[in-house]
From Swiss-Prot:
A GO biological-process term: translation
Keyword Cytoplasm in record: no
Family statement drawn from the similarity comment of this UniProt entry: Belongs to the universal ribosomal protein uL3 family.
Described function: One of the primary rRNA binding proteins, it binds directly near the 3'-end of the 23S rRNA, where it nucleates assembly of the 50S subunit.
Assembly and interaction partners: Part of the 50S ribosomal subunit. Forms a cluster with proteins L14 and L19.
Lineage of producing organism: Bacteria, Bacillati, Mycoplasmatota, Mycoplasmoidales, Metamycoplasmataceae
Region (Disordered): 125-149, 210-230
Entry-linked Gene3D superfamilies: 3.30.160.810, Translation factors
Species of the source: Mesomycoplasma hyopneumoniae (strain J / ATCC 25934 / NCTC 10110) (Mycoplasma hyopneumoniae)
Keyword annotations from UniProtKB, A to Z: Ribonucleoprotein, Ribosomal protein, RNA-binding, rRNA-binding
GO MF terms held by the record: rRNA binding; structural constituent of ribosome
The name this protein goes by in its record: Large ribosomal subunit protein uL3
Domain of life: Bacteria
């Protein structure tokens, strides 16, 4: 399974040669450094640890300085393990060229935090009756309904109640790669990805792989030629 670390730049749109607009997410994918090799002999599973985005020197910690020195690099801000991703040695780099247009990937990030919210917005619960005893104002009709059986004498775990909305780990599956820009270290995906701008993302090969597609032919202004995404 291939994987790489990136940062969300934002969203835009591209046009095909047929004039169809495609909403796309642009992800910055710098060179990832292999900072650790994990093997079955020592850890009972195979994986590599990738790191990206330099830390400020004022935030270096002594243990991580030694850890990253083994890979001949400086401490990084974003570190993740990728299982069953082999063929690399300690200190090698992994770049965006491991992917190609037409492939599908899963993108994991932290969704936007929206603060405190009630159950209607947070869990899509129904609003109560506005008449026949529903009460006046907005509060009574927007309250949570039943919290469980009366014989339980307690509120069981997992009940849908008001609380913080968003800021959760979210994975969007099977996003199509529209373009790979190795010169600028950018990956262009069809659709949206979790999180705000500048948030860190984990990009992996899709688990649920749709039928393969031919790369989209993009329209280029002031040109009579169509561009295959290479």
């Amino acid at each position: 399974m291939k994987g790489i670390l990136g940062k969300k730049v934002g969203m835009s749109q591209l046009f095909t040669t047929e004039g169809i607009a495609i909403p796309v997410s642009i992800i910055e994918v710098p060179e990832n450094i292999v900072t650790k090799i994990i093997t079955k002999e020592k850890n009972s599973y195979d994986a590599i640890q990738l790191a990206a985005f330099d830390k400020k020197q004022s935030r270096f910690l002594k243990p991580e300085i030694g850890h990253f020195a083994k890979a001949n690099t400086k401490p990084k801000r974003f570190i993740k393990e990728f299982r069953d991703f082999q063929g690399y040695k300690l200190g090698q780099t992994v770049d965006v060229s491991i992917f190609s247009p037409g492939e599908f990937v899963d993108v994991t990030g932290t969704s936007k935090g929206k603060g405190f919210a009630g159950t209607i917005k947070r869990y899509n619960q129904a609003i109560g009756p506005r008449s026949h005893g529903g009460g006046g104002g907005s509060k009574p009709i927007r309250q949570t309904g039943s919290l469980g059986d009366i014989s339980g004498n307690k509120v069981v775990k997992g009940m849908t109640m008001p609380g913080r909305l968003g800021h959760e780990k979210v994975t969007k599956q099977s996003l199509e790669i529209i373009k790979v820009d190795k010169e600028n270290n950018l990956l262009v995906l069809k659709g949206s990805v979790p999180g705000p701008k500048k948030s860190f993302l984990v990009i992996k090969s899709a688990i649920k792989k749709p039928n393969p597609k031919n790369p989209v032919s993009l329209f280029v202004p002031n040109s009579d030629k169509e561009v295959k995404n290479e």
